[in-house]
Amino acid sequence: MSMPGFSYDGGFAQYVTVPDADANLVKLPDAVDFTDAAGMGCRLMTAYHGIVEVGQIHPGDWLVVYGAGGVGLSATLVATSAGANVIAVDIADDKLALARKVGAIATINSRETDPVEAVRELTDGGADKSVDALGISETLHNAVNSLRSRGTHIQIGMTAEGPVGDVALTINDLIAKEIDFRGSFGMPAVEFRYLLNQVAASKMKPGQLVTKTIALSEVNDALTAMSTYNTVGTTVITDFTR
């Protein structure tokens, strides 16, 4: 698998090359503006595949999302547009405020409240589905433990490489509760059609995730802020003249 920004140059430019463009280049519908398109990016596509295709979310499902960064906020937006009841968990109040703006019906600051107990109370026993959008031991365990019996966990956040990224799970608990544990990675190009139809019909508005626009010359500062988790929502390059 090859991906822009990993296998070849990314898209921080007015013009980019697209290998195998007949499969990898997708025409933007006229009804989708550039802000919504930029708000989609890797994070929303990854969340869409995890929530809709892998997680098989349904209207009325209780979903708890651990992490309100790019992927977590996108998961909240996607699940809300599908009719789910979303609970967002994070340690930053500004990120939780944005989660509410894009559809979360409840938010939990896990620095102040036991998130597992809070989710169980809000859902009368446990969520139907959970997402770990971070990929660290604490959020993974809390996400799984927030589920009701026969609940489904969707693991989107990737752990660190090597032994340091290994996470031990209490398998007997998963067996006893008959938990369905599913991994989700990226989004195949074939799903673009369904995602873009949702956006074109205004059933989903990725532009809600865009909180800042910058010039190309400001990219390095933006990436530094992202690497230290000092951002909220999505930053989009709109000025390529400087």
What are these regions (language model features)?
Residues 1-25:
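Glycine-rich phosphate/adenylate-binding loop and adjacent beta-alpha elements
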Residues 15, 49, 64-68, 88-89, ...:
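Glycine- and other small-residue-rich loops at beta-strand/loop junctions that grip anionic moieties
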Residues 32-113, 117-118:
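Mid-domain Rossmann-like dinucleotide-binding core that forms the NAD(H)/NADP(H) cofactor-binding site
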Residues 47, 136, 219-222:
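Non-catalytic, hydrophobic alpha-helical segments
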Residues 55-57, 80, 91, 97-180, ...:
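Glycine-rich cofactor phosphate-binding loops and adjacent beta1-alpha1 units
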Residues 63, 121, 128, 154, ...:
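C-terminal capping/lid region of NAD(P)-dependent oxidoreductase domains
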Residues 120, 124, 162-212, 220-221:
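C-terminal substrate-binding/catalytic core of Rossmann-like NAD(P)-dependent dehydrogenases/reductases
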